[in-house]
Amino acid sequence: MADFAKENQFTPDQQAEIDAGIKNNIDVSIYAKPEFLAIQMHEIRIGLVEQIPVFYYADSRYDWFQMEEIRKGLEMSLDVSKYADPEISFDRMRQIRKGLEAGID
């Protein structure tokens, strides 16, 4: 595994998320990228720890609110393909997710 601490390209908050992932024994290379904000890294790390398919949202085009909505949908085994689109606002994503939870397609 790469030594992300020595690359000195991350903020202290980003480095903390990388360190937390290493402690969680997950593949931090998925999110240890300078283009992700620390809070985005956090959402990806949570997904990795929970063993959900983070490839749906491990993309810097999503803000962390959008990532959270996609992650919550994945946790509930919802069809997130209906709203996993960086062009859809997080509040619209939430509406779609809540509809899917309620059985509304």
Question: Whereabouts are the PLM-identified features?
Answer:
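General marker for long, soluble alpha-helical cores
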Residues: M1-D105
